[in-house]
Every structure is written in C-alpha cells, then in structure tokens.
Amino acid sequence: MDDVGTKTAAGEPKERDPKRWLILIVLCLSTLVLVIDNMVLTVAVPPIAEDLNASASDLQWILDSYMLVFAGLLLTTGSLSDRFGRRKVMLIGLLLFGAASLIATIADSPEQLIGARILMGVGGALIMPSTLSIVITVFDDEERPKAIAAWSSVTMVGLVGGPLFGGVLLDHFWWGSIFLINVPIAAVAFLAAIVLMKESKGPWRKADPVGMVLSMVGMVSLVWTITEWPKEGFGDPKVYVAAILSVLCLVGFGIWETRVEEPMVPLALFRNRVFTGASFSIVLLTFANGGLMLVLSQYLQFVLEYTPTKTGWAFAPLALASLVFNALSAVLGPKIGNRFMAALGLAVIASGFFTLATLEPGDGFGIVTTAMVLMGAGGGLAMPAAQAAMMGAVPHEHAGVGSAMNDTVQQAGAALGVAVLGSILSSTYGNKMPDDAPGKSDESIVEAFSEAARTGNEALVHTARDAFTEAMSSAFVVGAIGVLVAAALSLVLMRTRGGDTPPTAAVPGAAQPDGSESAEASADVKTGR
C-alpha cells in the first residue's frame, strides 16, 4: 500500500497496526545484526590473518570493503525502497546478508572473504534504510519517539556488545563463527518480516540512474578518502584523486538533482531548517563518538593494561546509560521538544569528553566510568531526538531516502571522526615523544611497546604512556568542541516557527491536517527545488 501519512484522507487518525511492537522487534533485530557484525570483526583480525595468511593490505580490505559498499549504496537503496517497497527491499537485504555471511564462514582465502564482505555491504545497505523508514510509517506521531528511541538504542548495544560478544565466540570457536551467527538471526528476521509486516512504499517515480551513479561514486570516493587520508597523507596521489572525484561527483549530484524531473533525493528537504539542523547535529555527534572507541580502547589496553575482553566490559556503563536515557528521551522529548532534548544531550556528551581529557596515566577506572555514564546518557538523550526531528521533517513518501540520508550522515560523521581524531592522536603522540626515541616508537604506542619488548627498555613504556595520554586529551578536547558546536546548531537551526512542535506538517510534501498536500510544496519536493 502507498503511504498516506498518519491520517486518513478525512483527517482521522490512521488505525494503529496491532502488530507494530512486534514489527519493531524485527526491525531492531535486523539493525542489530548489522552493527554487531562490524564490531565483532575488529577482534577477529589476528585469527583471520593467521588462518588465511592475509597481508596487512588484505586485512585492510576485509575491514573497509563492507563500509565502502554500504556507504556508497545507502542513498540508492533508500530510494529503491520508497519506489519498490520497504518490506521487499529489506527482505532482499536480509537474504543477501545471510547468504554472504554463510559464504564468509567457508572462505579459504583473503579474496573470497573480501568478496563476501562486499556482498554483505550490499545486503546491509538494503536493510538499514528500510528499517527506520518502516518505523516512521508504522508508528504515528504520538508513538514514533518511543519507537525511534528503541531502534536507536540497538545501535549502541551493538557497538559496545559487538567486541565483547566476538571475544566470547573466538574463545570457544573458530573465526568463522562471527559470521555464522548472522545466519540464524537473519533467517528469523526474514521469516518474522514476512509474517508480521505489510508492504509500504511511496508513489511511483521514474528511476534516476544518473543520480544513482553520481551518489555511489561520490560517497565511495568520499569515505575512501576519509579512511585513507590519516594513513597515506593527503599528498598521496590516490587520496588526492579520490578527494577530487568525490567533490566532482557530489557537486554534480547536487546540480543534477535540482534539474531532473523526479530526483532520487529531494534536496528541497535541506531548505527545512529542522532537517538541516538535525543532520548537522548527527554528523558532529557521530564525528565525536566515531573516534571515541578507537582512542579510548587503546588507552584502556596500553595504559591501564586491560585485556581485550575487559576492555569490552569497560564500555558497559556507556551502553547501560544509553539504554536508560533512550527511554527517558522517548518520554521527555514530546514534552520539551526535540530541539532542547538534542542540545541538552549533546552538552552532556561534551562534559564526558572533557572528563576524559583530564585522564592521567596513573588514573584508575573511576574517571573513565564517570565519563562513560555521561556520554551514554547524553547520547541516549540526543540521538533519538535528532533522528526524530530529522525524520519528522521527511514526507512519508520519501521515508526510505530520508532514512538513508540519516544513515549516510552517520557513516560520514563516524568515518570523519576516526580519521580526524585518529590523526590528532597520532601527530600529537609523535610530538610528545622525545627526539631520540628509539626505532619507530614515536609513530605509535604499539611500536613503542614492541621496541620496549625487544630491547627491555622499561623507561620507553612509561614515556610512551605519558605521550599517549597527552595526545588522547588533545583528541578528546577536539571531540568535545565538535559536540558543543552540534549543540549550538541544534538550538539555532532546529527552531520551528510554531515553537518546538513536530515539524512534519510544515515540511514540503508532508501531509496537511486535512490529509492533502500543498501543490507548491509537493512540487518543490518532487523537483528538488
């Protein structure tokens, strides 16, 4: 059935789907399998390298191939879900993701595993936009904040629980088990979706093949540039060419979408200040959080000497606080408004980053726990509010591509956070190490520990820990500033003319109280003007 918003043509509220909360469980399960899979892989690199005799380049492609394909296809798959049906696209994605996971378990060469990861990226790109867009169309305005908060909390559980879950699997089974576990989860979600969900899609629109190609090439080039820049340097010819290609394609995409009769992405959405403000807030929030686990996990393992499993458990306070405050956000958001909820949450996250910036090599886990609780609480308040504001500004017929844009800005923000905060960490660490540091110990704390183990130089270990902690503080201050900028943008841009009321009715192409659409507004969204 086509989308008609949350009201009938007569202006009466749509009847609530009695299976909607079961549907939400299926959507959360589908999202969880994607997040956990990526996080689990980070702890499986050593056994994969040993068993498949994979080089450093092979391992990099095993890790990056999924993300490149996933990020590159999001806008296209979101548009396809609006066009052909969100349930149908999600089912195809689950089928492909499960099959690719099965292929990954039997891979006996790096090339086969990379191929399986590429297929998993395609499957993930089909699944992810469909999940949030179905949440938007199944739940009405009153229940939607609660549903989005529940869906959002699953991401945090996967991010924190993935490495821990992977460590448990690898302690008892071979590395292929981290992929095999995806198969039954995908199968359950597939069957449950068939039984519980009705199809939903927007009005039929012509395909936009030029927009699809430009968005795919542009996003793949952008993400590749962001991930390779810290390792190769911006002066590297490959990075330089990829950066130019991404700019040309994405600028070309923007120009094309404003001229084509039926654009893949309605760029008129960015004329809505709530949508734009929420988008920027999400980018900067994920920018800060993207580098958090990269930087803090190294501190826990190399400075506090935690094992990988203990490091995973150390992030539990963040996940628990996020779950609690996700629920609180769902209750308070409709009362005080998404704008203030997002700004409050972002300010709390910034306080967590500033707390982490005070860490010293001799500090225990107490300060880390305090910071984790603050950041989990802030994320639990801010992310659902920003996502609800962003998706509330998207007409229902564009729910799929709106969800894809939410996923895309998160991917770009997280990748940029890893690149920028990682670069700050690396360069500051090198500057803090003495000029006569032996070997390559001034390049990373890993190299310093290797050099110390080889030469028995215990003083080098202490020097490296001091330098790393100072570098980490600099990275976290930058993260805090990014989040504070996001908070300011939330307050300034996410303001609606009628106060902090849900913005959907004022959005071009959104359903009006009588169930109709403004002809001019609808045309603006259709043509991207």
Name the predicted role of every residue range.
Residues 171-181, 228-239, 307, 427-480:
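A membrane-interface helix-boundary motif in multi-pass transporters
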Residues 144, 184-200, 218-227, 246-259, ...:
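C-terminal membrane-cytosol helix-exit motif in multi-pass small-molecule transporters
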Residues 2-195, 325-330, 335-340, 347-350, ...:
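Transmembrane-helix bundle of Major Facilitator Superfamily
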